[in-house]
Amino acid sequence: MAKASTKKRKVIVESIGEAHISATFNNIIISLTNKKGEVVSWSSAGKMGFRGSKKNTPYAAQMAAEDCSKVAMEAGMKKVKVYVKGPGNGRESAIRSLHNAGIEVTEIIDVTPLPHNGCRPPKRRRV
């Protein structure tokens, strides 16, 4: 059977971009995009090999942010505007490790969605 020839699309990378950090209760997903919103590099705690309850730890977020920023810096990204979404543990450590990796953080914006009393939340856990 012939292999389908798919051409990998090339994303135009500028020196200024955006970092979208989604920190849920179960996982942390970090996407570095250009100004248009096209993804330059992405990483998550699950992609880094963490499983189960270890995925939502500050250390897992740090490892994911370092992996993501390494690829973006090779592509030529230098400054990012950070958008943080969700209530997860690794929010601050992901931002800190982006900065320590050599990418300058210009501003941090919290875009966590807040309901105007929409859906009923899940019932309380009884352990």
Curated annotation (Swiss-Prot):
Q: What is this protein called?
A: Small ribosomal subunit protein uS11
GO terms for biological process, alphabetical: translation
- Tell me the organism: Flavobacterium psychrophilum (strain ATCC 49511 / DSM 21280 / CIP 103535 / JIP02/86)
Instruction: Please give the Gene Ontology molecular function terms for this protein.
Output: rRNA binding; structural constituent of ribosome
Which keywords label this protein?
Ribonucleoprotein, Ribosomal protein, RNA-binding, rRNA-binding
Origin superkingdom: Bacteria
The record ties this protein, via Pfam families, to: Ribosomal_S11
Query: What is its biological role?
Result: Located on the platform of the 30S subunit, it bridges several disparate RNA helices of the 16S rRNA. Forms part of the Shine-Dalgarno cleft in the 70S ribosome.
Q: Can you tell me which family this protein belongs to? A: Belongs to the universal ribosomal protein uS11 family.
The family database entries (InterPro entries) matched by this protein are listed as: Ribosomal_uS11, Ribosomal_uS11_bac-type, Ribosomal_uS11_CS, Ribosomal_uS11_sf
